């Protein structure tokens, strides 16, 4: 049996981060039965503080918001921790101070996916470059440097180069990351799909469980303070007569809307609200991906300003799901018609096969 350890943002209380960690784990377990797979349970002080219910470095505005919604946000924290500790195959917990290669007996180490190599991430650590591993084989899967990684100081660029040079196989999430690394490193690299796309609809459906919300609804999932998305959701709610459910607090607006708050939403609940929604509005990459996996009527706004989201929509034949906020009622009606996901499913199967072949080669499978 081969032993594989994966290091990733598995404990970030972020839907995409936790679910991509789960997806890569399950894909390897399903396709490589001779592999014992564990996620290295790195819990840095910075990451724990960042995702605590009451972050010390948060603004006074956000702290007031937390007080106002404390019980929901505490439940959300509990839901994330429950998922991390029951659904992920973890090693014992390590901090940035006590993690060493001698504590493990892995034959292979994987970095990825997510933005683990993005030095601008608030919870970044050089440990995600597997700096503590000196002997075993290292590879990456669908990892990202983020958009600005190599615009850092020459010292940082040199450190990234030295770290990545020790990897035997390199798979990155975005072409931009490949282009950046190719400027400083002469090694073969390939682009692979985000881990959440590795698993088929039926696996995610089973994880999502029985329907939580009994009435019809629109699910709105956005990452930032997006007035246009809020206004569009309000308009669509009036047009369809369906309520809007939101899972993510955006404090400047959360006191002034008539949406249904579900701020206690953990990873499983997030999947559930997308799966059973009548319509999904999202400006998030993972929101768009899961809506597509569940074959829901997806609406996204201004995706052309977000390269990652736009490339996904174009690649999978879903560019027509991207709209301007001021579209007329006739255009809205077209959006609510049945969506053709044939191209998406065909292209996805090809990409899943590419990822399988990459991992088979990287893990030395016959």
Task: Indicate where each model-derived feature is located.
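Active-site anion-handling motifs in enzyme catalytic cores
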Residues: 1-366
């Amino acid at each position: 049996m081969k032993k594989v350890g994966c290091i990733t943002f598995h404990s970030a209380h972020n839907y995409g981060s936790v679910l991509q960690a789960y997806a890569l784990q399950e894909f390897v377990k399903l396709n490589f039965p001779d592999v014992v797979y564990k996620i290295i349970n790195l819990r840095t002080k910075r990451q724990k503080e960042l995702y605590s219910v009451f972050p010390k470095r948060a603004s006074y505005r956000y702290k007031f918001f937390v007080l106002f919604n404390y019980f929901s946000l505490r439940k959300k924290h509990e839901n994330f921790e429950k998922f991390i500790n029951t659904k992920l195959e973890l090693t014992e917990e390590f901090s940035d101070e006590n993690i060493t290669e001698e504590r493990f007996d892995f034959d292979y180490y994987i970095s990825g996916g997510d933005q683990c190599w993005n030095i601008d991430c608030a919870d970044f650590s050089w440990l995600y470059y597997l700096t503590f591993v000196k002997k075993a084989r290292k590879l990456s899967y669908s990892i990202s440097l983020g958009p600005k990684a190599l615009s850092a100081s020459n010292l940082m660029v040199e450190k990234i180069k030295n770290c990545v040079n020790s990897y035997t196989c390199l798979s990155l999430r975005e072409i931009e990351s490949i282009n950046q690394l190719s400027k400083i490193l002469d090694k073969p690299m390939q682009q692979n799909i985000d881990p959440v796309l590795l698993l088929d609809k039926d696996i995610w459906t089973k994880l999502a469980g029985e329907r939580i919300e009994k009435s019809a609804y629109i699910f709105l999932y956005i990452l930032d303070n997006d007035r246009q998305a809020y206004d569009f959701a309000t308009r669509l709610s009036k047009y369809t007569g369906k309520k809007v459910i939101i899972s993510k607090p955006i404090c400047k607006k959360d006191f002034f809307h008539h949406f249904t708050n579900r701020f206690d939403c953990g990873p499983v609940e997030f999947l559930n609200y997308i799966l059973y929604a009548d319509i999904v509005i999202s400006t998030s990459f993972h929101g768009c991906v899961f809506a597509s996996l569940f074959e829901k009527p997806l609406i996204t706004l201004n995706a052309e300003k977000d390269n990652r989201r736009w490339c996904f929509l174009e690649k999978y034949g879903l560019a027509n799901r991207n709209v301007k906020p001021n579209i007329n009622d006739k255009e809205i009606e077209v959006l609510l018609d049945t969506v053709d996901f044939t191209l998406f499913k065909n292209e996805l199967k090809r990409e899943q096969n590419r990822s399988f072949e990459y991992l088979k080669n990287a893990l030395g499978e016959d």
